[in-house]
């Protein structure tokens, strides 16, 4: 679950990290009042969307008059911002962050993330802040600094100081960075974050360290114990189908292909998508109905898949263990009747009550393609979209 910049900065402040003075606004007039309250002779107006690349897309603007604040707010609020990181139709801008400007001497990069190969939280930093870290890692990997955090001891002072010295910080800045880094580690651990990224972390003309921009992502699997954070979720930023799937207890991720997939089990779902690609097709989604789905849930899953206009065929791949094949068959029949599916549906069933499930499908009178195995199912689905 992603947080907006203003939400992330509020968390940073709780852990002693300096952020610019700012106010959130939902209307152009509120943006003007925010700038007036912040005072100064220049402000930055930032669109609040869950995507990077806002600056290049026109979502971050430096303004010097209150009239400009209003004009930029009007141009952003109620519109959709398209960046290289989000969907082709962009994401809605419902709020802007009006921020006081600061004199910048240097721009740094700092983040906390989970290195899955090491199974550790890692502090990552670079003196090349304000740039895309992926490009830095690719073109100049020597500029990426890392310290691996021990799960028992956490991030210790000497590790933070090592990074500070490598970044070229001096004097009081070293102690300030050490406090900041240890605060970030506590924030990361205590809030079950999956990613915490400050880019840039600036050094002001006075030598202070300030988080100018921040990205935070909370581990979805921990939201049950992070109620305060879960309540901050902005569903308008998520794919509508993904939001509906979440409410239905389904694991759904939209992709760019044209073959809809409904599978039980994440591993089997990924294997199914691999086979579709292997045989020349492109999956339109990842959808795991899990082991406890009902016929109603399966029908709802069909509706979510069909909400994607790019879907030209659907492949249902079920290995019945906890999930019984007759339940899946009932859901398929219900969905086809309710939604009026007019595209090919390829079904591969194996496992618990498979014969009953196949019988239900064959006697339903519906146009459903039965597959003998997973490879056959993938081949038939790919062939169906090419007709």
From Swiss-Prot:
Domain called ATP-grasp: residue spans: 9-244
Cytoplasm keyword on record: no
Disulfide bonds: none
Signal peptide: none
Binding-site list for ATP: 46, 53-55, 99, 102, 107
Complex formation: Heterotetramer of two alpha and two beta subunits.
Record's protein name: Succinate--CoA ligase [ADP-forming] subunit beta
Originating species: Methylobacillus flagellatus (strain ATCC 51484 / DSM 6875 / VKM B-1610 / KT)
Name of the encoding gene: sucC
